[in-house]
Regions:
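His/acidic/aromatic-lined binding-pocket segments of jelly-roll/cupin-type domains
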Residues: 78, 85-88, 123-124, 131-132
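Conserved metal-binding segment of the jelly-roll/cupin
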Residues: 125-145
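An anionic, turn-rich surface loop/hairpin at beta-sheet edges
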Residues: 105-127
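A short hydrophobic beta-strand segment most commonly corresponding to one strand
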Residues: 147-160
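Short, conserved beta-strand element in jelly-roll/cupin
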Residues: 81-96, 100, 110-114
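A short, N-terminal "cap"/entry segment at the start of jelly-roll beta-barrel domains
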Residues: 18-81
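Bacterial N-terminal signal peptides
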Residues: 5-16
Length: 160
């Protein structure tokens, strides 16, 4: 009888472990704590970067990618022919200059231009908790305008 009582807890543990399924391929889960763990390293990386910018690629899949970005100064003007950007603001504040025309942008990769300036466009103030979606072929640039830093989670949806 004593052996049976010893075997019952072991059997329960084995059955519950077998009942749990593995996460599906491609599933990712980032908690606020796991994202916060990257902040100090990204802050250090940004302090040595000429653009005062650091990025941590979290996942790269055929149709999308996810990254964490830390900025301590204005970003470059950007334009993506086929990608959608979705920003989830974690902390800090910035102004998003969006729309208008990218002038003198340089091709930096397939379907992507950076640098240059944006003529026209509208400004949207961003702060923690905000989410924005930037469609393909829309120039955009983050401006800190006096803020010391800006942290955001980015999903890039690839359209090619």
């Amino acid at each position: 009888m004593k052996r049976l009582w010893l075997l019952c807890p072991i059997a329960i543990l084995l059955l519950s472990a077998a009942a749990q399924e593995a996460d599906p391929a491609g599933f990712e889960h980032w908690t606020p704590a796991s994202l916060k763990n990257f902040e100090s390293k990204m802050h250090a990386d940004a302090s040595t970067d000429p653009h005062h910018f650091a990025v941590k690629l979290l996942a790269d899949f055929p149709n999308d990618s996810a990254m964490l970005v830390h900025r301590e100064s204005d970003g470059q003007a950007e334009w993506h022919e086929t990608q959608v950007d979705v920003f989830f603001v974690q902390s800090g504040s910035a102004t998003l200059l969006i729309g208008g025309t990218l002038v003198n942008g340089e091709t930096v990769g397939p379907h992507e231009k950076r640098n240059g300036t944006i003529q026209g466009g509208v400004r949207r103030k961003l702060s923690a908790g905000d989410v924005v979606r930037i469609p393909p072929r829309v120039p955009h640039q983050l401006l800190l305008e006096g803020a010391s830093e800006f942290n955001y989670f980015v999903i890039k949806v690839k359209g090619y």
